[in-house]
Amino acid sequence: GMVGMSIALLATVLGVVTDHHLLLVLGLIVGGAIGIILARRVQMTHMPELVAILHSLVGLAAVLVGFANFMDPEVHFEGVEQTIHNIEVYLSILIGAVTFSGSVIAFGKLSGKISGAPLALPGRHWLNLGLLIITIVVGWQFVNESANAGIGITSAGLNPLMIMTAVALLFGIHMVMAIGGADMPVVVSMLNSYSGWAAAATGFMLSNNLLIVTGALVGSSGAILSYIMCRAMNRKFLAVIAGGFGTSESASIGDNAVQGEAVAIESIEVANLLSGAKEIMIIPGYGMAVAQAQHTVCEITKVLRSKGINV
């Protein structure tokens, strides 16, 4: 992965037609230094929130590139090509803005800076529907204003584009705020998918085949992973996109939660508690990996197998 990204960055720097290579190299140095510092300081237990904040940067990049491409006076399209290009710009900024604001809220919830309790506003689904209608109407206005503007006029359609950006940011905030903190892993996976689609839309806008392919791969794999996670947790996939995910079920689980303090026990004690079973399946997950519990699990497995239990 590191080698591939290094080759991609090198090809981008050498392939870009610009006289400001010094700024590009400076940006690479600053970004690389920040990445190295984060990789060394962030613990595995904080990895989900790091992934969330990195997704926000992908969304922000899509928004900034979209505005820069739309306002570039050297970009000229006519007729159907102009309409298609404007739709690509619109979708890139739309998905990027939702990804950015949603990922920032997800980072805040995972890091404890924002309460993990779901924010269930009355009529939240009607609010989502209203935001969707506004996005469609403003998009139609944006395409018409841009098509009717003269060549070289970059300000035409800018106001609808800014309105849509604000609406998309609001939707991203509302979508993630309505989700309980315990369900954040599914949300992070979904935001990963959003970041991929934002990159793919940016690739169409810039006529960059590499961005289109990689963005589609990330977007589709993230969506499939989110669907599988929802099925495993007995959740509805569409509820993740609409918001309000994990409000009723999570609340009922919390009301019936067992009170008291957790007591640590040894691996031998765990094996003795499981000695009455005939077959045991141990499924490793993220928590086991973070806790580095593989050695303890191995000891439990040895004790159970010595008693004739199929593990």
Each model region followed by its residue ranges:
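Transmembrane alpha-helix boundary signature
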Residues: 12-25, 37-47, 63-79, 143-150
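Structural signature of hydrophobic alpha-helical transmembrane segments
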Residues: 15-32, 85-100, 154-167
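Transmembrane helix-loop junctions at the membrane interface of multipass transporters and ion channels
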Residues: 68-80, 143-155, 186, 193-213
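Cytoplasmic-side transmembrane-helix entry/capping segments in multi-pass membrane proteins
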Residues: 1-6, 24-27, 46-58, 118-129, ...
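Membrane-interfacial segments at transmembrane helix termini in multi-pass membrane proteins
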Residues: 217-277
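C-terminal ends of transmembrane helices
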Residues: 33-51, 103-118, 171-184, 226-230
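Mobile "lid/hinge" segments at catalytic clefts and subdomain interfaces of large enzymes
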Residues: 180, 194-238
